[in-house]
Amino acid sequence: GLLKRIKTLL
């Protein structure tokens, strides 16, 4: 998903 990708960066 997209949110998961962002959460990984954070």
Swiss-Prot record:
Post-translational modification: The C-terminal amidation is crucial for activity, since the carboxylated peptide has antimicrobial and mast cell degranulation activities drastically reduced compared to amidated peptide. However, the carboxylated peptide has no hemolytic activity, like the amidated peptide.
Summary of the function given for this chain in its UniProt record: Antimicrobial peptide that exhibits broad-spectrum antimicrobial activity against both Gram-positive and Gram-negative bacteria. Also shows antifungal activities. Exhibits potent activity in stimulating degranulation from rat peritoneal mast cells but not from RBL-2H3 cells. Has little or no hemolytic activity towards human erythrocytes.
Consequence recorded when altering residue 8 to N: Increase in antimicrobial activity, but no change in hemolytic activity
Species this chain originates from: Anoplius samariensis (Solitary wasp)
SS bonds (residue pairs): none
Principal cellular location given in the protein's record: secreted
Effect annotated for changing residue 5 to F: Increase in antimicrobial activity and gain in hemolytic activity. In R5F/T8W; gain in hemolytic activity (EC(50)=2 uM)
UniProt subcellular location: Secreted
Protein name as annotated: Anoplin
GO cellular component terms, semicolon-separated: extracellular region
Tissue: Expressed by the venom gland.
Lineage: superkingdom: Eukaryota
Outcome following mutation: residue 8 to W: Increase in antimicrobial activity and gain in hemolytic activity. In R5F/T8W; gain in hemolytic activity (EC(50)=2 uM). In R5K/T8W; Increase in antimicrobial activity and gain in hemolytic activity (EC(50)=130 uM)
Phenotype for residue 5 to N: Decrease in antimicrobial activity, but no change in hemolytic activity
Effect upon mutating residue 1 to A: Decrease in antimicrobial activity, but no change in hemolytic activity
Phenotype for residue 7 to A: Increase in antimicrobial activity and gain in hemolytic activity
